[in-house]
């Protein structure tokens, strides 16, 4: 009986470690930037399987999943509390391989994962090397097909939307399975 309890006591921490060890490791890209009343942080991790299928490049055809974590800053005038995810933004990216000058562009989509909502896309990189990432972030009013209302009356109104902003970062991609990669 004693051995049964000892085995159970060892199995619980081990199973928890294995469960949490399976989580994806996010690699920060530069430092978060404060722009337009928002904190804009960029990360990458291994490519992600998404639903609905076909909403972005399949994970098997991608090198990384790029993410923009965009949260309201303390000075936000649009009614969001500090740290709130800011929805309905229009986010696109430009990724330049600084070693060869090749540029690729795309759009980030809003999505949710176990660490919360963010904007992202699966991306096929142009091999290992140094990259420059530009994130172009526009307010909800930039998308004429997605409506996100804003109170403008004297009693309950919020400030006007921010002007579009650009966050720029540089990072080294070592390749999959390499130190400094995921």
From Swiss-Prot:
Q: Which domain of life is it from?
A: Bacteria
Which keywords has UniProt assigned to this entry? Signal
Asked whether the UniProt record includes Signal among its keywords, one would answer yes
Would the keyword Transmembrane helix turn up in this protein's UniProt record?
A: no
Q: Which InterPro entries match?
A: Metal-bd_Tp34-typ, Tp34-type_sf
Q: Which positions make up the signal peptide?
A: 1-24
Family statement: Belongs to the UPF0423 family.
This protein is called UPF0423 protein BAB2_0840
Record organism: Brucella abortus (strain 2308)
């Amino acid at each position: 009986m004693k051995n049964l309890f000892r085995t159970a006591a060892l199995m619980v921490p081990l199973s928890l470690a294995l469960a949490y060890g399976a989580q994806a490791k996010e690699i920060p890209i530069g430092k978060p930037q404060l722009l337009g009343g928002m904190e804009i942080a960029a990360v990458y991790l291994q490519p992600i399987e998404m639903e609905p299928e076909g909403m972005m490049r399949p994970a098997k055809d991608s090198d990384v999943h790029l993410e923009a974590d965009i949260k309201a800053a303390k000075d936000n005038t649009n009614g969001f509390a500090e740290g709130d995810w800011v929805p309905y933004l229009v986010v696109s990216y430009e990724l330049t391989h600084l070693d060869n000058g090749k540029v690729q562009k795309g759009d980030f989509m809003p999505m949710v994962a176990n660490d919360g909502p963010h904007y992202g896309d699966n991306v096929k990189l142009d091999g290992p090397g140094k990259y420059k990432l530009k994130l172009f972030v526009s307010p909800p009013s930039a998308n004429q097909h997605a409506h996100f209302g804003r109170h403008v009356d004297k009693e309950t109104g919020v400030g006007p939307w921010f002007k579009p902003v650009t966050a720029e970062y540089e990072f080294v991609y070592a390749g999959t399975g390499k130190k400094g990669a995921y």
